[in-house]
């Protein structure tokens, strides 16, 4: 299965069976990538969900599900001193009140997915949500659950779980999820893109 997409509504499916599908929110996050199977979802959980489910549903209909979902992109550091690329070992949704909903409904609502890792890169826990974290209060709150924060990773992990496809999440630290984050993210992209490409090569993906 192959997909080259410029946004969530324009996606061309190509016949490249049993290969990984590479997923990015913004093409600048991995500008040097040359892959037959690249899905650009745009930023945010809903954009990612619609683009990814469209691609995977079409692929399943044609019997061309990818061998692995590989999400590469940037993340904010919730803990001081983090830098470089991390392979995600656990991902959760930081803006989903699963405990409160479980108490109200009487049914469990799990919020967290464990992922297998290669052992070749540093690992981290990732929190996903639809807010760009750029204030100290939010940073401190979310840091109780994870050390990195992004806006798509949990969606990719959940889609992989639902479709029975292995998942790899690679996140490069682009900012410190603080009041300077919005101003530093764009400047960090070229170096982040290069490091993510090096990580893909290290994992032979």
Language-model features, listed with the residues they occupy:
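Extreme N-terminal starter segment of soluble prokaryotic enzymes
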Residues: 16-21
């Amino acid at each position: 299965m192959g997909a080259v997409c410029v946004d969530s509504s324009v996606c061309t499916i190509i016949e490249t069976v049993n290969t990984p599908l590479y997923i990015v929110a913004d093409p600048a996050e991995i500008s040097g990538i040359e892959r037959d199977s690249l899905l650009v979802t745009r930023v945010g959980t809903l954009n990612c969900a619609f683009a990814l489910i469209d691609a995977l549903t079409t692929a399943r209909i044609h019997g061309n599900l990818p061998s692995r979902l590989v999400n590469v992109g940037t993340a904010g550091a919730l803990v001081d001193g983090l830098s470089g690329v991390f392979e995600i070992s656990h991902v959760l949704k930081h803006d989903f009140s699963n405990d409160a909903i479980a108490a109200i409904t009487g049914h469990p609502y799990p919020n967290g997915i464990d992922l297998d890792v290669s052992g070749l890169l540093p690992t981290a826990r990732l929190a996903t949500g639809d807010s760009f974290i750029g204030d100290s209060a939010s940073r401190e709150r979310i840091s109780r659950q994870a050390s990195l924060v992004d806006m798509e990773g949990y969606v990719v992990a959940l889609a992989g779980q639902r479709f029975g496809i292995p998942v790899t999440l690679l996140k490069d630290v682009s900012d410190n999820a603080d009041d300077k984050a919005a101003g530093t993210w764009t400047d960090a992209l070229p170096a982040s893109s290069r490091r993510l490409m090096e990580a893909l090569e290290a994992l032979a993906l």
